[in-house]
């Protein structure tokens, strides 16, 4: 870890009412003496002159000094809050850099220092960037929950439970005569099952948090002329796609990024799925399946004038059978203005079925509410947290090792192999909070932060 003292502008570049310069490190006190002529009382606002090396006043403002470790970074921190003109702030940074041993901070380096000094774990540090980058109220609330340690708490509890069970298993291994009795008495199995169940709950919450942060990818799929492009236009609120009566009008993937009450939604319109000899249409259909395979949700668009069926297995079994196993599907029966169907949503064998008219807008608002619900929208979000793709991947790895450990226990009563799977699960979970994380990953994470954060 570097011991350099760093400086950067903490407020956004450009013109503003207030501009803040942040200094962190051992030389922060030297900067205070050079620029202010004195060291402010820790944690007190001090109105004073900011001076250059000749004693001329550069600006006037508030100086705040935080004595380490009682600061955001865990080091001595000095903040100079002056007027927000960029020229003035640049002059002030230039003055600070005249003090020996000071350099400009790299992106995210203040947060990295806080992480290295155990002021934040990795999920909390990431939550700072997520809070700044939040594009909706839901995302901001969830990022704040993560910053306050909600996600970390869940992960730490899992790590503690896995560690405790691992120690119990390894203790049994140390007494080989009793090992089989230990492994078969049910206590280890029950503890393992509880951990797997808890991890499943955390995975579901993290998946929801990832959708809130990154948005949900929804693919509209179905046969040609079912009204897919009309639905895209209805959801987007504009004419994004060309709509005609000619089957196969859409031959490529069309994308729209919208917000439903602040929740980010990525809508993908695809070519109608059918057997065709048209080379261009075949390429479009291949791209459609690529989008479907990476979707968070599929809206299975059905022309209601062609079938009365509501169970997707009855409507088009080959399509449903080809979908990824865990991909959620919502059946959308279109052209309700022609069929006269009741617009009420129904559940059919685990599938939500909506009746709409993409052309007239009938039922589209109810479908939007459904999508918001899938994304975890709540008017008053409590207890949720934000998550990133790397968190989901780490949770998946941990779950995989726990399942392998379960097999070693139930089938082979293999204590050493169970202990190894528990160790691997522990490592995967610890990567989330940064307890065991490679330097390359840390560099990648913090380099995506703003300078000054």
Swiss-Prot record:
InterPro entries named in the record: G_TrmE, GTP-bd, GTP-bd_TrmE_N, GTPase_MnmE, MnmE_dom2, MnmE_helical, P-loop_NTPase, Small_GTP-bd
Domain TrmE-type G, chain residue ranges per copy: 215-376
Gene3D superfamilies in UniProt: P-loop containing nucleotide triphosphate hydrolases (3.40.50.300), Probable tRNA modification gtpase trme, domain 1 (3.30.1360.120), tRNA modification GTPase MnmE domain 2 (1.20.120.430)
UniProt-listed Enzyme Commission number(s): 3.6.-.-
GO cellular component: a single term: cytosol
Class of enzymatic activity (EC top level): hydrolase
GO biological process, alphabetically ordered: tRNA methylation; tRNA wobble uridine modification
Primary subcellular site in the record, as a coarse category: cytoplasm
Cofactor(s) demanded: K(+)
Binding site for (6S)-5-formyl-5,6,7,8-tetrahydrofolate: 22, 79, 119, 453
Location of this chain's protein in the cell: Cytoplasm
Co-factor binding comment: Binds 1 potassium ion per subunit.
NCBIfam families, alphabetized: mnmE_trmE_thdF, PRK05291.1-3, small_GTP
Subunit structure: Homodimer. Heterotetramer of two MnmE and two MnmG subunits.
Family listed: Belongs to the TRAFAC class TrmE-Era-EngA-EngB-Septin-like GTPase superfamily. TrmE GTPase family.
Name of the protein described by the UniProt record: tRNA modification GTPase MnmE
Organism annotation: Shewanella sp. (strain MR-4)
